[in-house]
Amino acid sequence: MDTNSIISQIGNTPLVKLKQASELTGCNIYGKAEYFNPGESVKDRAALFIVQDALNRNLISKGGTIVEGTAGNTGIGLAVVCKEYGLKLKIVIPNTQSIEKKETLKKLGAELIEVDAVPYSNPKNYIKQSKKIAEDLNKKSKNGVYWANQFDNLINAEAHIKTTAEEIWNQTAGLI
């Protein structure tokens, strides 16, 4: 196991039997303990794949910037991964998020752009603003700017097809 890199610790999380749910249903119910990932969530996998995809396609290079609109764990996962790859991270976040979440993101190196919390249908929605910010920054960046776009980025699902699904298959010896 490679222990020289925090991102090498993403994935291979335990599969644990959920005792009460199993007893109540009469079935064996399991859950992936994704809180064992460095960013403590399932979003670390997606963040890793999204960043690696952007790097592999030469959309960004070291010193480049990832931009994402997130109110949740994707931002923390991206912060962990971006730090490892020497990338900047700008998070567009609703100003209604907890101080603790915002402080965590800042301590992990993310620059926060706080915006009003408005419905997705509003052009000022944090996700739509993140796309616009990425487009504007990319016009003047020499190392590239990439909009992570977690909700529509197919790499997000690919992360789970290639890692989570395979882990579950192996951890259950194919008996699922």
Regions found by a protein language model. Give the residues of each.
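PLP-dependent amino-acid enzyme catalytic core
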Residues: M1-I176
